[in-house]
Amino acid sequence: MKRILSLLLLACLVLGLLTGCQKTPDTPVVIQKDQEQMIHTAQHGRDNSALLAALEVPERFTGDWTGVNDFVHVTADAEIVLPNADKIPTGSIGRRDFTQEDADNLMRVLLKGNTLYEEQGMTKQQALERLEQLQAMQRGEIPVDLDGGYEALPGAIERCAEYARTAPDGDERVPAETSFVSRSENLEEIYGWSEVDGKTMHLFIQNCAGFLDHANVFVDGYGDLNSSSAIALSPIQDELPEPLSVDFPLEDAIRQGDALMEELGFERVICDNAYPVLFTRSSEADDAPSEEDWKSYILATGYELQYVRSMSSFPISWTPISGGAVAENESFSGAWYYEVIMLDITKDGLVYFEWLSPHTEPVLQVEDTQLMPFDQIADIFAKMIMVKNSDVQVANEQNGFITTRNFEITKVKLGLMRIRAKDSFNEGLLVPVWDFWGHSVWEWQGETSDFGEEILLTINAIDGSMIDRELGY
């Protein structure tokens, strides 16, 4: 798994949960859900006051299934992960932007209240050197290395010359604006750098209406405004010549993370996932490092912690699936990404903080949700994993060669998922779902493609209907 630790300057775009108790469909159609019906279904059903006994959940999920004319094969010997909670809630949640209070809080805690300075671009000397380089391209003395080619050179030369006239001579410190500055009708941001305990820290907070709001604070070298500095890489162990090791325990990182969440004022967040990572230059980390020189690429090792909001101690699970997709035959009208706070911690402490898509505090609607027995969920999985992959048969007929899809289920996790209301990107219902994680390997004509670990299927734990995490319903 890879995640670029950088600040992607997003181009800001202008911009009724599960039909309760429905029969599981024979085609993977994802439908809008009716919220009132879902609340009713959550309140009336089996008595599962004792969580494990009521759900009849085994210690492991096991099985072996073949379908779609033997083109799809699924195996499972997976752990079943349940939250540390006695009851399963259902609730509601909303979307919000970062507030000035949020920004002030991040600067107070992560920058320790130190002065925020404007990010500096090229110095005057660097700008003049670049100007000479562009002019040499125009004279034909060196190859043209510029987006747009030779035709783009006059404009680039003019802009570079203009910048050089006012560029700083060196290390000038200009205090930055610490309130949100509007960049366009739908975009406002705060950004700059500060010196904290002898380290340069960068801060970037952006509200982008109808798209993705995000806040990033990081130590210089572990992220970059131009998306070029460092990556946190959680590699497949088999791809490394030696097992990945971290020289301090995970428990220490979680203690640091919990303390930071408390200092930031997050009262109901949970560390829902944690794993070791190594940090390496992004330009050199497109693939796992080679055996010859992989160690020379490593900046540090540490852990990545994922914090999510919770309701009644039940986590609102985050996944790498962003939730910003558009249904087929629908035009883009907005996106609502799932919320997460990610911390990257090395032996030297926090090196990267990322907060995506802030949400409101969840509101409890049903304290003890009634769920479908797990054996029924397992039966639905066995059927729907084949339905979801039934397209392989048509593909094989059209392609003229055989492709097989092999799935290995590695984890089954119960958590809350935010399902947005019909035609709304601002309000959603929190419902319990079963996420089936696993590896998928496709094989054809002697070739293989491994898609790594991902969520293969999400099933509503109340009524057993299928949910598309990308669409958000």
Segments predicted by a language model, with ranges:
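Positively charged n-region of N-terminal signal peptides that target proteins for export
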Residues: 1-11, 22
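C-terminal motif of bacterial Sec signal peptides marking the signal peptidase cleavage site
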Residues: 16-20
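Preferential activation on post-signal-peptide N-terminal prodomains/segments
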Residues: 21-332
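Activation/maturation switch segments at domain boundaries
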Residues: 30-34, 416-473
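Helix N-cap and loop-to-helix transition residues
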Residues: 99, 249, 372-376, 460
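A short, surface-exposed beta-strand/turn
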Residues: 202-225, 317-357, 444-473
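Segments that shape or occlude catalytic/ligand-binding pockets
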Residues: 253-444
